[in-house]
């Protein structure tokens, strides 16, 4: 008799995606982060739902409702910090996942790569709106500063900002709509994830060698289910260490002060996962130029497949490209550090240098080095 998982309409889809899926036999732990991102999304949706049960999206009570969750709701503080630090884990896995795609040439699967970029943008938008909801000082001023960037758009900028705000400043209307979008977007992300997987399973996964693996496949279960489970346990260990021992390590102390439109915090800065883009934004003295650089810093991922000049797909056997990749990683770490520093000498100069290096590496240096490697290998 045929196993039910192979004939039942719903189970068949699950079976072909997670059980009998033919997977390359040599994919390393860098391929674990896709499943970890799925786990992060599940954690965020579940904890977010329980937070939404107790939260009120009103300027007068938002801060108090978050305080009430932490003080009075049974295990409320755990749920709140799981959600806040879960976002950090989400972005950590996202950055590693994208980095792995760049290193091993996964961008040669264009549909999967482009859906991934749309997912990155959507997750960033969701996280930004979520940061506004506790209605602390950094929530309010972060929302004001970031939404105000749209006023740099010629002609329609000011009208657009007021339309997003729902008034002439960040207020009750802004908070209500941000809560509505923050609630609905994770479900849109879940739908995009399914499309991402659909396109991935059309072609099959890439592997560390970057070569065709049709001749050497193994079933996803039990080999990679066990491997993913180990990754999940390590992720949960890191997340629970943060939640139970250092819950405020990645947060901002200013967000424990209720939002006050009359008092600007000394240093307005976003969460750590946006600091690299914030540093690029601040490195350009012109407002419109800064906004364009900010958007381009993420959108540049879309043209990476066109900038791929190497004859080999993966960087596994390309030591010069590897060095450039790790310089890019170090540069992004530098930008993240600079984003959290005040706008003064020498941080301005370091930020500008790191921003120029970021764009130069992706647009000029890495493609040129790849061409050099082709010559060296006589390809």
From Swiss-Prot:
What is the cofactor note? Binds 2 heme b groups non-covalently.
- Chief location bin: mitochondrion
Q: Per its database record, what is this protein's job?
A: Component of the ubiquinol-cytochrome c reductase complex (complex III or cytochrome b-c1 complex) that is part of the mitochondrial respiratory chain. The b-c1 complex mediates electron transfer from ubiquinol to cytochrome c. Contributes to the generation of a proton gradient across the mitochondrial membrane that is then used for ATP synthesis.
Q: Identify the PANTHER family for this entry.
A: CYTOCHROME B
Q: Select a single GO molecular function from the record's annotations and give it.
A: ubiquinol-cytochrome-c reductase activity
Record-listed a ubiquinone binding positions: 201
Give TM regions.
Answer: 33-53, 77-98, 113-133, 178-198, 226-246, 288-308, 320-340, 347-367
InterPro entries on file: Cyt_b/b6_C, Cyt_b/b6_C_sf, Cyt_b/b6_N, Cytb/b6-like_sf, Cytochrome_b, Cytochrome_b_C_euk/bac, Cytochrome_b_N_euk/bac, Di-haem_cyt_TM
Q: Which Pfam families match?
A: Cytochrom_B_C, Cytochrome_B
Q: Where does heme b b566 bind?
A: 97, 196
Q: Where is this chain's protein located in or outside the cell?
A: Mitochondrion inner membrane
How does this polypeptide assemble, per the annotation? The cytochrome bc1 complex contains 11 subunits: 3 respiratory subunits (MT-CYB, CYC1 and UQCRFS1), 2 core proteins (UQCRC1 and UQCRC2) and 6 low-molecular weight proteins (UQCRH/QCR6, UQCRB/QCR7, UQCRQ/QCR8, UQCR10/QCR9, UQCR11/QCR10 and a cleavage product of UQCRFS1). This cytochrome bc1 complex then forms a dimer.
What PROSITE patterns does the entry give? CYTB_CTER, CYTB_NTER
Keywords from the UniProt entry: Electron transport, Heme, Iron, Membrane, Metal-binding, Mitochondrion, Mitochondrion inner membrane, Respiratory chain, Transmembrane, Transmembrane helix, Transport, Ubiquinone
Instruction: Locate the residues binding heme b b562.
Output: 83, 182
Its membrane topology, per UniProt? Answer: Multi-pass membrane protein
Instruction: Provide the protein name.
Output: Cytochrome b
Give the record's GO biological process terms: mitochondrial electron transport, ubiquinol to cytochrome c
Species of the source: Allocebus trichotis (Hairy-eared dwarf lemur)
GO cellular component terms given for this protein: mitochondrial inner membrane; respiratory chain complex III
Names of required cofactors: heme b
Family membership = Belongs to the cytochrome b family.
A further note on this protein reads: Heme 1 (or BL or b562) is low-potential and absorbs at about 562 nm, and heme 2 (or BH or b566) is high-potential and absorbs at about 566 nm.
């Amino acid at each position: 008799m045929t196993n039910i998982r192979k004939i039942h309409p719903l189970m068949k889809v699950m079976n072909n995606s997670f059980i009998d899926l033919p997977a390359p036999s040599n994919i390393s732990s860098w391929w674990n982060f896709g499943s970890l991102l799925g786990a992060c999304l599940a954690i965020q949706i579940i904890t977010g739902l329980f937070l939404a049960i107790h939260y009120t999206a009103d300027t007068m009570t938002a801060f108090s409702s978050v305080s009430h969750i932490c003080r009075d709701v049974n295990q409320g503080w755990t749920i709140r910090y799981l959600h806040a630090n879960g976002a950090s884990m989400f972005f950590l896995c996202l950055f590693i996942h994208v980095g792995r795609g760049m290193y091993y040439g996964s961008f040669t699967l264009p549909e999967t790569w482009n859906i991934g970029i749309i997912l990155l943008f959507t997750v960033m938008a969701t996280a930004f709106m979520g940061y506004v909801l506790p209605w602390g000082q950094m929530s309010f001023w972060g929302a004001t500063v970031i939404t105000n960037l749209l006023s740099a758009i010629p002609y329609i900028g000011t009208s657009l900002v007021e339309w997003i705000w729902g008034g002439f400043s960040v207020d009750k209307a802004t908070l209500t709509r941000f809560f509505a979008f923050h609630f609905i977007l994770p479900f849109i992300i879940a739908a995009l994830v399914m499309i991402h997987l659909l396109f991935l399973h059309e072609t099959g996964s890439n592997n560390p060698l970057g070569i065709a693996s049709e001749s050497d496949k193994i079933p996803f279960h039990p080999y990679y289910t066990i491997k993913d489970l180990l990754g999940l346990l390590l992720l949960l260990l890191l997340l629970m260490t943060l939640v139970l021992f250092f819950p405020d390590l990645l947060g901002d102390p200013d967000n424990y002060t209720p939002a006050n439109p009359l008092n600007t915090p000394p240093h307005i800065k976003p969460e750590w996962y946006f600091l690299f883009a914030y540093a690029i934004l601040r490195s350009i003295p012109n407002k419109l130029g800064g906004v364009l650089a900010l958007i381009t810093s993420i959108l540049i991922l879309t043209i990476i497949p066109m900038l791929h000049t190497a004859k080999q797909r993966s960087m596994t056997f390309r030591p010069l490209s590897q060095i450039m990749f790790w310089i890019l990683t170090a540069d992004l770490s530098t930008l993240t550090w600079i984003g959290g520093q005040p706008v003064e000498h020498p941080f301005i100069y370091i930020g500008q240098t790191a921003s120029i290096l970021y764009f130069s590496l992706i647009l000029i240096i890495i493609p040129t080095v790849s061409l050099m490697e082709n010559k060296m290998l006589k390809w």
